[in-house]
């Protein structure tokens, strides 16, 4: 019997570990979806209605949209602050505590946007309040991504980390699908009612999503890697400063990797709605295409994550960055056909192929660049500083280019530049995958 006991114990331990990991994955994905719903609902509203509701009327409707995306970019400027604050909390007090606070702040800010008066009702106070709440959203989202990724990747077996870490991004896709779906439902209202009050519904509905998300996060177990570091007395008193001191190159690499991934994503998923209006494509067609593309990408990113466990992180990420450059012009060619199937194809290729290969690999890749005691701070700092220039500025630059040239080709060239920055970064980034024994 003595010889059987170790085998029985190991099986029980493996089953318990598998159940715990599954619970962490499900809870993390659900919590991430709740938070990213709040974040993406602003991006959709900025593309569709915020320009005419919160900014002075002008002869060129793109000017109002430009103002809405400027407020969108301000949220990204606040993200590094969130990365520093919540990275410190996550490395000092645990990933779980940080994630609960990010969701609380995001929920309050998003619900508040749904209560704001418009420019016609309150004048300049309206865009000022919008910017203030957008800043709060930015602070919360700055601490969200790194924590959500690490909760899964730090509990996953090394040989399957790419696959499991990719699951964290399903929350991002899920939040986007939920927010776009909410706006599709709201747009079923007559246009006048949608502009008068219907646009508020997706923001006000976030209170239900927010409450569920807090409950889910509060009941998450702590990261296994963090608990081991804490028990060994290896937590840092000043993790952000230590990350900068010990991992300056890795932080720069994380920033460069983010440029094509984040910048491309917001051009495909946010700016495309603006371009659709410019090109005379029905907004319902564009929203449907975006939702379809995100659903397809949610499955694709898992496949890319698994492939990164087999081939390595760098080759898979390179596929995405190079594909982004290749798709820069064909993406708009397909949109300009005004054919719904070809529009759907453009969005699916842009997201599932180009962006999917990068976002499916990024969580494991950047997490493996940093040591446990400063990992949250290092990941958050590199990820969120890049967000200012990539996600925050990309749709703003794209709208400005479209407004000035009234053509898509400058935006295509800009997409190619984003891809080139990441390709060069990959050439200087070390492979982090641990080969299977």
What annotation goes with each model-predicted range?
Residues 315-361:
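C-terminal transmembrane helical hairpin of 12-TM major facilitator-type secondary transporters
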Residues 46-79:
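Extracellular/periplasmic helix-loop-helix junction of adjacent transmembrane segments
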Residues 43-44, 248-297, 390-394:
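Extracytoplasmic gate region of multi-pass secondary transporters
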């Amino acid at each position: 019997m003595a010889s059987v006991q170790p085998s029985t114990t190991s099986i029980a331990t493996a089953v318990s570990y598998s159940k715990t990991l599954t619970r962490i994955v499900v809870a993390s994905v659900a919590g991430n979806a709740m938070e990213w719903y709040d974040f993406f609902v602003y991006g959709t509203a900025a593309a569709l209605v915020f320009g005419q509701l919160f900014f002075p009327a002008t002869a060129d409707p793109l000017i109002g949209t430009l103002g809405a995306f400027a407020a969108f970019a301000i949220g990204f400027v606040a993200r590094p602050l969130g990365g520093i604050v919540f990275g410190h909390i996550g490395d000092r007090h645990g990933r779980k505590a940080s994630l609960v606070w990010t969701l609380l702040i995001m929920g309050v800010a998003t619900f508040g946007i749904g209560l704001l008066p418009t420019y016609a009702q309150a004048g300049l106070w309206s865009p000022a309040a919008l910017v203030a709440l957008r800043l709060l959203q930015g602070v919360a989202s700055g601490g969200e991504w790194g924590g959500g990724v690490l909760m899964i990747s730090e509990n996953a077996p090394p040989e399957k980390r790419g696959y499991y870490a990719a699951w964290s991004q399903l929350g991002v896709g899920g939040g986007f699908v939920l927010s776009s779906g909410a706006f599709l439902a709201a747009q079923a209202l007559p246009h006048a009612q949608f502009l008068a009050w219907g646009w508020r519904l997706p923001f006000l509905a976030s209170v239900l999503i927010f409450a569920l998300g807090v409950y889910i996060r509060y009941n998450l177990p702590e990261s296994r890697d963090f608990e081991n570091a804490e028990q060994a007395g290896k937590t840092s008193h000043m993790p952000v400063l230590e990350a900068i001191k010990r991992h300056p190159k890795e932080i720069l690499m994380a920033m460069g990797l983010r440029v094509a991934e984040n910048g491309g994503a917001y051009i495909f998923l946010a700016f495309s709605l603006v371009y659709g209006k410019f090109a005379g494509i029905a907004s319902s067609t564009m929203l449907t295409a975006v939702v379809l593309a995100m659903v397809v990408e949610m499955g694709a990113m898992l496949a890319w994550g698994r492939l990164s466990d087999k081939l390595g992180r760098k080759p898979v990420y390179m596929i995405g960055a190079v594909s982004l450059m290749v798709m820069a012009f064909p993406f708009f060619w397909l949109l300009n056909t005004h054919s719904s199937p070809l529009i759907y194809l453009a969005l699916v290729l842009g997201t599932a192929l180009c962006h999917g290969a990068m976002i499916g690999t990024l969580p494991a890749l950047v997490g493996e660049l940093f040591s446990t005691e400063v990992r949250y701070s290092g990941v958050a700092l590199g990820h969120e500083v890049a967000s200012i220039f990539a996600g925050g500025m990309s749709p703003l630059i794209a709208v400005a280019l479209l407004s000035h040239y009234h053509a898509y080709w400058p935006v295509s060239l800009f997409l190619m530049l984003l891809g080139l920055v990441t390709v060069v970064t990959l050439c200087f980034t070390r492979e982090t995958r641990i080969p299977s024994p």
